[in-house]
């Protein structure tokens, strides 16, 4: 009897994760096999940034919400947290947790607000140090900060540094601090006219190495009129604008990039245009040398989700959702996802795609390559499907 029950459960799981690919192979990962790496007391997480170092140490940055008022949707007590483990222990990871910043916390001279949350880590491998960029809320509003972390002990440095942005307009170079006023000045100086409102700029969750530089692409959280800005850096702190992407006419709230043969592939979630038919995930292609638009951004997915790109074994892959993270059944939210992984051609169009349906919500992807293998971190609510504010960080190897 037990064997019958087990067989029935396995069959149901197989149906729940029914996958298809144009070409016949299975989806590159089974979400049920992913290991959970977020803090065990985690109640909510909707960010994931991952760095895999040479020795196999994995650092996953995310946010943790100890208290959440699910009635009015307001957050409190949010912490920026880093989970550390090693790939050799992937099946049963031994995890170390480091808190970067808490609400009301302080590093050096920067005092985090007692009432506003701290947000969104973006990890940068600085060689002998791990650098964590994150959002604090201080005297100048949202501020993008950087703090160094000892990769062995996970101890934090005793000071934070503000991230700067340098750009050129009419032959004149300007440098602003990545604060609310600074980023607004950047947009005004480059001539963005329909900038509706400001929250905070959002870099890609990981930095991309190309030649002597690290590259990133910056969007802006839910701000109509915002456009992506491709930047480069050597230290993860001082960012220099290479070119902007005004072709993303519906804005770019959250972005990701991959670079191949001096072509810069950019994928972005729209910044909530008033015309809901325009909302979704868009893909574009640019020349890294002069910023020429080689493929005008086109809608690759009809649902606003936080996508990612990965250059792996000479191929560019895109991952994003193709339906909402929840549906309403009998007056209640039921969470599930349909995930698509697409292989991108040289011109930025889709060559082929894999899809998988999950019985729970999966989103916020970050793909990494390490020694010829591909890995994925993402946010999921495997055990907490009843509430969208609850989530876990999961990690798995991709079969690419």
Regions found by a protein language model. Give the residues of each.
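Beta-rich carbohydrate-recognition and catalytic domains
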Residues: 20-46, 51-114, 124-253, 258-305, ...
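Elongated alpha-helical scaffolds
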Residues: 116-118
